[in-house]
């Protein structure tokens, strides 16, 4: 969930009144938002970078507001204040419209076929006669950053470029060229660089280096030229210095290149609808014509589509648990920046503006009705039918086991279900384990790459983090592991396991075996080799020390797991220095 930080004085300016902290907190709650924190620029920088870095900043209050991830129209103070003022019925919903076609015609972007290799789509728009001040200019830049981090998925799906139209001339060309053939002066630089040189230059830039891999391995890079061959931008990396916008910019040319065309529509609509309020003719946007040279297809942007939806009031009432009349529900929806009217008895026709791309289904309409009605006004009542909850047998069994194990002097550990690839393979001396593991498609950290196939890595990490505690350390965990299974509909299944480790100056095999005996006694399983009880049998497992490992065989000859002294390489790979005994069994056969 993105967080927007806005100075209180700017909020007051846009709301045209002063809210107290309590009033604004309640107002946010009414609209389905949350005032996360009240801080200041100085306090925020002091917290992250220290007192010296914050010495030149001011102490003006900054309200940090949590915004739903799909409400891109609330990512700037312009959209937030407008939406809440409409909600408070202080202003009507604006009507977004296209500007008249200039005498010189619409601006054009001609798309060359080579762009299909790297970023095939582009959209554009023009904001004419716009007036920026310091606050609105900063908000304009900040909105682009917020969009890049959210819907644009860090510029992989969409990259936004904004330019001073008075410094460049159309028609524009969107090309894809070899890096050595692209040369221009990038934003905030004093000399020209080739695209190859820029990749080296920005490889150490804390902000831009994250975007380099998006195009770095492509044979061609995307680039936008104006009529005179001036480079406007090299998306998704950097804009050109020549066309950068300033406080004095009067006409803004907006382009957005994309790998996802739908996301580009949404991004462009969001920017122009929020900032067209600063144009001489508010909420008026000039279109840009995009021409695909290879196919001859011509498209006009932005779309500014007003979509129509039809819902029935009984359906919405049932979802929320209220009983509103048609007219009452229409009034509530109008407060949420929608245009609703009664089309027929128990039927509403709703017009969704281009700011509300989050409205996709009748459920979204129901959510807006709930917000406008007020969640605090919903009456809680008991359902007409009773359903009595019953614990799953496996959970009931595990809860009983936990109580008994803790009573025996063992401490329970709770570890993450995800771990690194090394944790379940090389560190456990199990090179084949990765073929049985469920892998995360796009892991954010090295610690969360696969779903665990064993409980031992988590317990050994816990030991490593607590090795300064008094010995012995006796830990257990009773949780799920995830293993591949082609017989299930998703190709994997959960398996409930119990694992324990004993860490001391001696491996304490007798301690860990005593733990196993106690567990079996609690499960009413006696030592026996006739298929009715359990027994251990010497076995080889590379995780354990040779000659000090056994497999545990349960009723009906089912192999439950292994017990033994861990191999020294396993112990040292987790940062431990003393011997360690371990046991891990599957508890599901005991159901």
UniProtKB/Swiss-Prot annotation:
GO cellular component: phenylalanine-tRNA ligase complex
EC numbers: 6.1.1.20
Alphabetized GO MF terms: ATP binding; magnesium ion binding; phenylalanine-tRNA ligase activity; RNA binding
Cofactors that this protein relies on: Mg(2+)
Residues annotated to bind Mg(2+): 358, 364, 367-368
Annotated compartments: Cytoplasm
GO annotation (BP), single: phenylalanyl-tRNA aminoacylation
Domain of life: Eukaryota
B5 domain location: 304-380
Keywords tagged on the record: Aminoacyl-tRNA synthetase, ATP-binding, Cytoplasm, Ligase, Magnesium, Metal-binding, Nucleotide-binding, Protein biosynthesis
Catalytic reaction annotation: tRNA(Phe) + L-phenylalanine + ATP = L-phenylalanyl-tRNA(Phe) + AMP + diphosphate + H(+)
Known partners and oligomeric status: Tetramer of two alpha and two beta subunits.
Cross-referenced PANTHER family: PHENYLALANINE--TRNA LIGASE BETA SUBUNIT, PHENYLALANYL-TRNA SYNTHETASE BETA CHAIN AND LEUCINE-RICH REPEAT-CONTAINING PROTEIN 47
Protein's name in the database: Phenylalanine--tRNA ligase beta subunit
């Amino acid at each position: 969930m993105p967080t927007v930080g806005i100075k209180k004085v700017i909020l007051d300016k846009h709301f045209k009144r002063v809210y107290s902290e309590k009033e604004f907190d309640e107002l946010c709650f009414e609209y389905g938002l949350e005032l996360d924190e009240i801080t200041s620029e100085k306090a925020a920088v002091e917290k992250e970078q220290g007192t010296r870095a914050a010495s030149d900043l001011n102490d003006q209050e900054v309200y940090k507001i949590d915004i739903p991830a799909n409400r891109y129209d609330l990512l700037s103070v312009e959209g937030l204040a407008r939406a809440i003022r409409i909600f408070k019925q202080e202003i009507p919903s604006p009507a977004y419209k296209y500007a008249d076609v200039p005498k010189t015609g619409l601006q054009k972007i001609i798309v060359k076929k080579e762009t299909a290799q790297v970023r095939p789509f582009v959209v554009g728009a023009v904001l004419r006669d716009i007036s920026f001040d310091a606050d609105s200019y900063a908000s304009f830049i900040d909105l682009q950053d917020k969009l890049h981090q959210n819907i644009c998925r860090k510029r992989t799906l969409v990259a936004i470029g904004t330019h001073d139209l008075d410094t460049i001339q159309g028609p524009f060309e969107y090309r894809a060229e070899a890096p050595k053939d692209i040369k221009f002066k990038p934003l905030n630089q004093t000399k020209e660089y080739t695209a190859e040189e820029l990749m080296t230059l920005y490889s150490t830039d804390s902000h831009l280096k994250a975007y380099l891999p998006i195009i770095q391995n492509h044979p061609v890079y995307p680039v936008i030229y104006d009529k005179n061959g001036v480079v406007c931008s090299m998306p998704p990396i950097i804009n050109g210095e020549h066309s950068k916008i300033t406080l004095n910019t009067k006409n803004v040319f907006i382009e957005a290149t994309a790998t996802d065309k739908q996301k580009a529509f949404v991004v462009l609509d969001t920017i122009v609808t929020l900032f067209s309020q600063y144009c001489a003719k508010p909420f008026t946007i000039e279109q840009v014509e995009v021409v695909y040279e290879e196919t001859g297809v011509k498209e006009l942007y932005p779309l500014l589509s007003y979509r129509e939806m039809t819902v029935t009031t009984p359906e919405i009432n049932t979802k929320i648990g209220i009983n509103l009349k048609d007219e009452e529900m229409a009034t509530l929806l109008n407060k949420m920046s929608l245009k609703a009217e009664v089309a027929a008895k128990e039927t509403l026709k709703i017009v969704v503006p281009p700011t509300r791309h989050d409205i996709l289904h009748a459920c979204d309409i129901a959510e807006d009705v709930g917000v406008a009605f007020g969640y605090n006004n919903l009456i809680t009542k008991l359902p007409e039918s009773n359903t009595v909850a019953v614990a799953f047998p496996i959970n009931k069994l595990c809860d009983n086991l936990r109580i008994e194990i803790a009573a025996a002097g063992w401490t329970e550990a709770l570890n993450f279900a995800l771990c690194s690839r090394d944790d379940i393979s090389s560190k456990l001396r199990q090179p084949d384990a990765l073929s049985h593991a469920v892998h995360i498609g796009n892991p954010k950290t090295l610690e969360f790459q696969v779903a665990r196939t064993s409980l031992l890595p988590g317990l050994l990490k816990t030991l490593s983090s607590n090795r300064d505690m008094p010995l012995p350390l006796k830990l257990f965990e009773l949780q799920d592991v995830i293993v591949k299974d082609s017989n299930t509909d998703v190709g994997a299944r959960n398996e409930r396991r119990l694992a324990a480790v004993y860490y001391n100056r001696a491996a304490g095999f007798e301690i860990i075996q005593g733990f196993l005996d106690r567990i079996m006694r609690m499960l009413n399983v006696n030592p026996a080799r006739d298929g009715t009880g359990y027994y251990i049998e010497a076995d080889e497992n590379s995780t354990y020390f040779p000659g000090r490992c056994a497999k545990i065989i349960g009723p009906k000859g089912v192999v439950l797991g292994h017990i033994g002294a861990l191999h020294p390489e396993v112990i040292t790979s987790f940062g431990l220095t003393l011997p360690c005994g371990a046991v891990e069994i599957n508890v599901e056969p005991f159901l």
